[in-house]
Structures are given as C-alpha cells and as structure tokens.
Amino acid sequence: MEVPLLVTDFLRRAVRLYPEKTAVVDGANRYRYRELDERVNRLSNALLDLGLSRGDRVCILSPNSHFFLESFYATAQIGLVLVPLNYRLVAADHEYILNHAGVSAVLVDGEYTGVIDEIRDALPKVQHWIVATEEGEAPPRWQSWNALLASASPEPPPRPEPEIGENELVSINYTSGTTSRPKGVMMTHRNCYLNAYNMIAHLGIAHDDVELWTLPMFHCNGWGGVYALTGMGGAHVILRAIDGERIFRLIADEGVTFACMAPAVLRAVLDTPDKQRFEIRTRPRFVVAGAPPPAAFIERLETELGWQFLQIYGLTETAPLL
C-alpha cells in the first residue's frame, strides 16, 4: 500500500494530537490548532464558493501574518496552487508573475492593495480580489478575507475527486530573476513534504518548539517551516517586520526556541541596544542561510547571548534545503 506524501497531513496531525495547543501568535491574535484548522477550512470553503477549482492558481501578497499561514493549508487541501509573492517587488514585477502563473484569485494584505490596483487592468485572468485586514471595511472592489470566512463553513471542505496525489502542484515559487525574468519553480506535495522532514531532522524540530518568524513566509514557503513546525505541533510566533527590540521582546515573552534568517537580520539582532535587559529563559537556535555570515557574528551570538548558531544551504529549485 502506498500512502501519498501530502503537506495537508502536517496540519491534520497537529490538530489530532494537539487541538488545544497554541498554534499561532500574531499580535493580539492567538489561535489554538483546532481554531487554526477552522479558519483554514473556512477559507477553503470560501474559495470553493467563489467558484475556484482544482488546479487554479491563487497568489498571496503579504508580510508574515496568520493569514499567510492559513493560505498554505487552505489552498493545498482543495487542490489549488499557491503563488507567494515577494512584497518588496514593484507593480511591474507583480504583473509579470501574476500573468505568467495564470493566477485566478489574489489574496492581499491591506497595506498592499494599492500596488495591485495599479495593475488591475493588466491582469485579465484574475477574477477575485481578497484583502486581509484585522478590522475595518474592505477598500472598493475588494472582498474582505474575514467576511468571507464568517460566511463559510468551518467543517472540512469536500475532498477532491480523485484524491490529490503527491506529485500534484502545491505552490509555484518565483526566484529573484538575477539574470533575467523570475522563474516559477513548481513545487509538488512530495517536494515540500520531504523538505519538511529534512528540516525537522536537521534542525531538531519538536512539539515544544516555538519559532519566531523573522524569515519571510514568501521565501520558498518559509524554507518549509510552515509545514515542518506545524507537523510537529510547534507554535508560530509571527513577526511582520524586522525590529531588533521587538525580536528580543517576543523571544522573552513567548519562549522562542528557534528562528530562521539571513545574515542581515542576525546583525540587526546583535546590534540591538541594551539587549541584557530582556529576561530570556530559552537558548534559541538561530538558523542562517542566504549568505555566509561573518565569523564575528557567530562568535558574538554564542558568547554575548549564549545562543546556538546553525548554517544551512539551499535554493528555491530544491524546495529549498540541501
């Protein structure tokens, strides 16, 4: 008997084993795993109610947020393909990617509706425009994410027929396009599932881990952390923007045990003034990739703070860890 390797199994496992455990901390929002699962189901059902169907591409343009995390599982369990966008790009880049990927629906953080409105008329295939905001009404010509969830069922959506296979697409992740246009890397359930297992093994991720999201979730599906940490039943502590003092405060308050980042973020942490005023009871693992950090950064992390350093390597085309 063969069992397909599906990324949706990570959330199902966490809900089954840890329904009352904290899954997400995002500002004032705290969701247990059963609550996260309900929001995921509501979004899946809302997207189906809009007429989206298996194989359709749905993009998300957002900084780190609980909305972003929800989108990974809500699209995957009904056979949609998620296209995460880099919110640092300009409108022309978004126009190219959205048309190249054949996106049918856009999920956009409230801060970024303007950049999409600039190119709305150049996106002939997009039929649905959904904005994620915690409160307030949606801007003109946008539908509210939370309003869609409120009107949708929290029950699991109908299972696709035939059942989703492990070699079906789960996301299309665009590279930076260093020498030409960005390339769309087509990730399957199997790609992302095995990468998550690689991450769990290499980083020693466990059920009592608490990850601080210093890494953008759009970056190759958060290097796979959206799947790996969820599958183990850990807690996601969301950071919308890099701020050294905020990072230390969240590590202290939430008991953060690891974070993934580029060397520039590590430097922001090390250069935070008056670091010793924070009472930190954990010994976080700082996982760095993207470029080799200076040896002095590693020494400072281990000597000044007593934290652990891990270096990893990968690229979008390998899902991404090697």
Regions found by a protein language model. Give the residues of each.
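Conserved AMP-binding/adenylate-forming core of the ANL superfamily
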Residues: R12, E20-S65, L69-Y73, V90-E95, ...
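Conserved pre-ATP/AMP-binding loop-to-beta segment of ANL
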Residues: P19, W142-Q143, S153-Y174, R181, ...
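Conserved AMP-binding A3 loop
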Residues: R32-E35, V170-L194
